[in-house]
A protein has these predicted regions:
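Formylglycine-dependent sulfatase
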Residues: 1-143
């Protein structure tokens, strides 16, 4: 069986007040992704800050266990970057590419992605076109 490709999108400070969660704010592209993928309706933030929440999603550990008790740009870091899901995916044969911001390390190289596509800022108008370009050019599978 061919392993499925995985596209992990994590928007910054979006919240749940968007269309897929039953609210009136139209987000047709997010709705389409929710219709065709996975939508988590019974999830919660593991930490009160961006870095701690992201680190929990990417390691499967609470912030007090993974070390990300504050913001990465304020000096907090993971205890062990080998716990990042990227390493688990690589061991399963996946290729990983980062487009935009991960916000669990000031040095993106420590995360372990196979490729990092740098954009000047993490705003959607810069990140989305780069993501579309990478996907259209094609990636070795699985990704």
């Amino acid at each position: 069986m061919t392993p499925p490709n995985i596209l992990y999108l994590h928007s910054h400070d979006t919240g749940r007040y968007v269309q897929p969660y039953g609210h009136q704010i139209p987000t047709p592209n997010i709705q389409m992704l929710a219709d065709q993928g996975a939508l988590f309706r019974q999830a919660f933030s593991a930490g009160p800050t961006c870095s701690g929440s992201r680190a929990s999603l990417l390691t499967g550990q609470y912030p007090h266990s993974n070390g990300m008790m504050g913001l990465a740009h304020r000096g907090w870091r993971l205890n062990d970057y080998g716990q990042h899901i990227i390493h688990t995916l690589r061991d399963a044969g996946y290729r990983s590419e980062l487009i935009g911001e991960q916000h669990v390390s000031e040095d993106l190289e420590t995360l372990g992605y196979d490729a990092i596509h740098r954009v000047d800022r993490s705003h959607v108008e810069l990140v989305a076109p780069e993501a579309v370009r990478v996907l259209r050019e094609g990636l070795p599978e699985p990704w």
